[in-house]
Each structure stands twice: as C-alpha cells, then as structure tokens.
C-alpha cells in the first residue's frame, strides 16, 4: 500500500484521495460524552432518534483538504459513487491535468471490489469523466491506517459534549472543525438510496471485462482504465 500511495503522490497527473463513511449519528437530545462549558440537558435514555445522518468523507492527504457529505439515507454503493461524482464536479477545473484517481478504501460491505453495484457505478464514472480509477484497499483490521480515519477522530472530539439535536447542528459542527488549520467543505445529501441493489451474474461478468485486477491481490488493487 505504501508503494502505491508514494507512487501516486509523486506522479503529476495522479491525485490520491481517501474515502470512507463514519458511524451513523443519531439526531436528538442524546448524551454523547465529553464536556461542555455550559450546562446542557440531555435525555437519560437513547429513545428513537428524530433522524440520522452518516458523514461520508473524502480527504486529499497531500493537500490536507477535506470534504464531508452528510447523508440522511442509507450509505449504499450508489450513494458513495454519487458523493465521489459530486466531489469531482466541484474540483475538476482545479485538477484539469489529473488523469488518474487513486482511491484509498477499507474493505467495507458497500465498497469492496466484489460489490457488483459499486463496480458498475465506478465503471460508469470512469466512462463519463474519462478518468482512470485505481482502487487501493486496506486489508482487514488495517482500516485505521486509511488517512480519512484521522479526520473522524478530530470531528468526534470537536462535537463531543454537544447535543446534536438537529441536522443543521451536525452540519455546523462539521463545518467548524479544522484539519491542519483548514475547515472542510460540507454538503447535505438528502437523496433516498435503496439497499440491496446488485447486478446479475451475467451483468457482473461484463463489468469484470472493464477491470484490471492485480494478480494474487485482485480483491485489494483494481484499475478501471479510462477509454482511449
């Protein structure tokens, strides 16, 4: 993994990003631990939340830039690729010279390289934007080394001791955290995503023809090459 990341960071037309979803946040008057300078009344039992939000993060390690997407629906394969596409739309003019994205991921249930809908959506992304995407997965029990994980710890410390009793409050705290002196760019995602979407075996075989898997490590390193 270090070799892949170092090579990406040293290549002028390649941009490396780290992507992951944080644990779902319950919206409501719930105690979250931590300390507050003001007296805050919280519920003494975790009743049904008023809403939930799952932060999806995209982090650019070499630039120390962070992007958060507050998802109010299920974080599915479609959701993750939609966040990736939304992010690219906001930065593509800055990175017009970039031809390859190297994406650091953990091997989660919605984004692993055998997840048929995830791979189909990434193939569509590559075709649409004419970018090569290289997926570089951290092995089991090593996701803590994914750079985005360090950002989640900062966010958690930032809002501990606070009642996250509305979606606006969650977004406000996400916007005011800092990483190396910079605030993240934060977006709210209200689209509804269905779970369980998958391809047929025959359809996935067609997708596999667009994938280049590293021999012996095919689950962990996958290239989706842009069309010529």
Can you describe what each PLM-predicted range is?
Residues 1-41:
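Charge-mixed, compositionally biased segments that are often intrinsically disordered regulatory tracts
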Residues 5, 21-25, 60-62, 107-109, ...:
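Short, flexible loop/turn elements at secondary-structure junctions
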Residues 17-18, 100-107, 135-140, 173-174:
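Extended hydrophobic secondary-structure segments that form protein cores and membrane-embedded regions
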Residues 41-104, 109:
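Electropositive, glycine- and tryptophan-enriched low-complexity nucleic-acid-binding patches
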Residues 93, 161-228:
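C-terminal accessory extensions appended to soluble enzyme cores
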Residues 105-118, 139-145:
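Acidic, metal-coordinating catalytic cores used for nucleic-acid/nucleotide bond scission
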Residues 118-136:
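Two-metal-ion acidic nuclease core segments, chiefly of the RNase H-like superfamily
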Residues 135-157:
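RNase H-like two-metal-ion nuclease catalytic core shared by retroviral integrases
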């Amino acid at each position: 993994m270090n070799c892949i990341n170092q090579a990406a960071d040293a290549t002028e037309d390649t941009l490396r990003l780290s992507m992951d979803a944080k644990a779902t946040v319950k919206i409501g008057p719930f105690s979250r631990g931590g300390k507050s300078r003001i007296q805050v009344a919280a519920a003494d039992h975790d009743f049904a939340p008023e809403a939930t939000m799952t932060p999806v993060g995209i982090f650019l390690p070499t630039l120390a830039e962070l992007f958060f997407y507050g998802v109010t629906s299920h974080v599915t394969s479609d959701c993750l690729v939609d966040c990736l596409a939304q992010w690219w739309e906001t930065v593509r003019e800055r990175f017009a010279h970039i031809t390859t994205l190297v994406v650091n991921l953990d091997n989660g249930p919605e984004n692993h390289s055998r997840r048929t809908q995830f791979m189909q959506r990434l193939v569509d992304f590559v075709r649409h934007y004419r970018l090569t995407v290289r997926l570089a997965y951290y092995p089991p029990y090593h996701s803590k080394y994914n750079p985005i994980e360090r950002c989640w710890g900062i966010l958690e410390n930032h809002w501990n001791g606070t009642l996250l009793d509305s979606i606006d409050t969650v977004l406000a705290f996400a916007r005011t955290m800092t990483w190396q002196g910079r605030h993240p760019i934060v977006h709210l995602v209200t689209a509804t995503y269905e779970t369980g979407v998958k391809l047929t075996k025959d359809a996935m075989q067609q997708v596999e023809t667009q994938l280049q898997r590293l021999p012996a490590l095919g689950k962990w390193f996958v290239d989706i090459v842009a069309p010529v």
